[in-house]
Each structure stands twice: as structure tokens, then as C-alpha cells.
Amino acid sequence: MNTSIRINCSKSYDDFVEASKFVGFCLYLIPGAILHVLILRILLIKQRKVFRNNSFFRIFATDSVVSLVLIFWGIFFNRLFMFIPPLCPLVSPLFFEPSLFLKMYYWMYNHARMSKSVAQILMVLNRMCCVISPIGYEKIWNKLAVTTVFVVLALPFFGSWNLLLSRMYIFPSYGGFNASYVKYVQWASLSMFQSIFLLIALCFTIICSSVSLYKLIILPDRIKSAEKSLCFVSLFYSIAFLVVAVSQLIFVFCEVCLKNRLYLLFQFFAFDFLTVGSAVIIMLSSPQLSNFLGFSGTFYRRKASPPGSTVVKIFTSVHNNSSII
């Protein structure tokens, strides 16, 4: 489909109000991006020797890169051209004809969304394996180091391949424009694949976190701090993926809801909660990482383990005597 698809930018939106929405998004997206960059700097550069053998942080580093992709496109494309009305008549003509740039943006953005789900599945599996087999799990996961990164980045191709074949176009949205696509393969709906990835990730989060918490509770010497932190982290991810799944299911099953202007804002906030929140939650839950980042306050204070107790590294400790989470 190589025909031109033109749009008329809406003039019914107040420039100041729309720009205020964009600024509002930036107020938390930019700090979130900075936090992800700082975490990656610690994990991959400054303290690489400390964290390189920790399988959980390897997966989280991949997830952080994916989050940065989402934040970058969120700030510099979809929110920018949607909520800054004066840009619409200037920029929109660039995308009336088929555009490789528009295709790569739309593909990367939605591919990254599904990568978040895959990374979450691997992280909760990693935590569960740690609790079930605290001695041997790290050796197994380190053998899968390259595989886990590959899976996070490659598995979403099963949901995004049709975008590479399809025609991208822009349509009026708020005071600017947004992007969508004309399906090349009719049955391969992006919303269907995204819903599948999200619901599977939500199920894995609930099941694996429940198993992990149960195994912690029945330990001979219960580790209260570990139980507390696991509950905290699991609750966050469960709520985050539930909210995102609800926003996606509304898109699939409630056509009337899509006409409501608030729906798109809700979907943005739902994904942003997961994208930005993942960096915040890992910082609050890992005393070691928090200290490397220069933050004195953490979610909990380290407590000495009782003599003879089993130290379980749920996901943030990198040495046998590290702080438990």
C-alpha cells in the first residue's frame, strides 16, 4: 500500500493545555530514564565485576535497555507529536507517504513493549529458582546468560513480525498525531499478540512469586526481610502488569472505550508505571545497588541472620554474605 494517507490536524485543542500534558509526562519519564541509565552504568561499567555473575541483574540490565527504548520514543515521538499541536502541521506531511522511519519507530516501540513481558517472565523464574535451589541455581542461569538476553530481544518477533510487512500511517490524535498500521496479514493483530504476552507474564508473576514466597515461609529459619521484600516486589509487578493487561484488554474488547479521550492517557500511564517503576522498585529493594547509586535510604535495613540460618539470595545479593532481598 503505497498511496498517500493525509490528515488534517485538529485545531480544537488549546496549545497550552496540550503542552502541559507533555511536560507532565516528561516530569517522570526523564527522571526514570536517568535512573535506568545510572543503574546500567553501575551494572555494566562501574561495578561490572561485582554484578557480572548475578543472573538476575543480567536480565534486569536487558530490561532496562528495553525501558530506555520505550522512554526515548515516548518522549521524542508519540508524546511530542501528540501533545505539541504546533508541530503537527509542520511534521505530519513527512509521513503522508510510506516512511521507513515511521515503520522502525512503530516496530521498535511495540517490540519493546513485548520484550518487557518476556523479561518479567525470566526475572520471576530466576527468583523462584533461587528460592527452590539457592546453591545450584546461579550456575545453571549463568550458563544461560547469552540465551536469556537473546530470548528477551528475539522472542517478541513472534508478535511484531507483521509490523515489518505492514504499511504505517499517522492519524489525528489530540492536538497532534499518532501512528498505526494497515495489517499486511489480517489475522496477525498486534493487539492480540500484546495481550498474549502480557497475560502470560501476569500469570508467571503470580504463580512464581507465590511459589517463592511459600518456599521462604516454610524454611526452618524464616528470613523475614526476604519475605517482606519479595512480597513488596511481587505486589508491584503484579499490580503493574494487571493495570497494563486491563488497558490492553480494553483496547481489544471495548471499541466504544477507545473513543474516550482518557483511554489513551490511561494506557500511557499504565505502561509508564511499569517502565519507570521497575527502576524505582529495584533501587528500593536492593541495598547494595542503592548504595552504589549513592542513595542512603533503602526499603529496609539489613538485619543479621541468625546463627546457622540459610541465606537465600532472592535476586539482589551478589555474595553469600550480601544483604538479602
Curated annotation (Swiss-Prot):
Species whose genome carries this gene: Caenorhabditis elegans
Record keyword ATP-binding present: no
Primary location group: membrane
Protein name as it appears in the record: Serpentine receptor class gamma-16
Any one Gene Ontology cellular component term annotated for this protein: membrane
Keyword Metal-binding assigned: no
A single GO BP: sensory perception of chemical stimulus
Family to which this protein belongs: Belongs to the nematode receptor-like protein srg family.
UniProt keyword list: Membrane, Transmembrane, Transmembrane helix
Coiled coil (UniProt feature): none
